[in-house]
């Protein structure tokens, strides 16, 4: 019997809860690169995991502040297209509670169009593009 498949969980950090929602849906192993203190060693381990995982998943949400994950998904879709999976979620929630409750963040129309084009580019390169975590889990669990 072969080793269990493994997915690299790349994409939006910034206290986004997408990983917490996806992990219970997975029937395969995963590498979560989120750490409290990002160091050079963490970056080296992340590159190592991206290279050896069966799938490299990048989920982008409106809590994204940097753009490096976009570069990573395009890089992986060129270098490892059959292992690259991209998903962007239209909304995310800020963990902090304010007097109105949980703060919902969304992408504006131009950002949504741009991210849709990123997804289509990933597909043209041979990768997969999904719009929900349920679709992502379905693909990862069955391939």
Task: Show which residues each predicted segment covers.
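Conserved catalytic or regulatory cores that recognize and/or transform ribose-phosphate-containing ligands
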Residues: 1-143
């Amino acid at each position: 019997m072969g080793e269990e498949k493994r997915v690299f969980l790349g994409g939006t950090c910034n206290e986004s809860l997408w990983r917490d929602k996806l992990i219970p849906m997975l029937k395969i192993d995963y590498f979560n690169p989120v750490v409290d203190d990002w160091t050079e060693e963490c970056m080296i381990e992340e590159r190592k995991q991206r290279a050896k995982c069966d799938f490299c998943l990048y989920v982008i949400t409106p809590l994204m502040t940097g753009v490096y994950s976009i570069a990573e998904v395009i890089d992986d879709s060129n270098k490892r297209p059959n292992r690259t999976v991209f998903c962007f979620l239209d909304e995310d929630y800020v963990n902090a509670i304010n007097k109105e409750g949980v703060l919902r963040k969304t992408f504006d129309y131009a950002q949504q169009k741009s991210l849709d084009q990123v997804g289509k580019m990933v597909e043209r390169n041979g990768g997969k593009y999904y719009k929900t975590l349920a679709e992502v889990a379905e693909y990862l669990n069955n391939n």
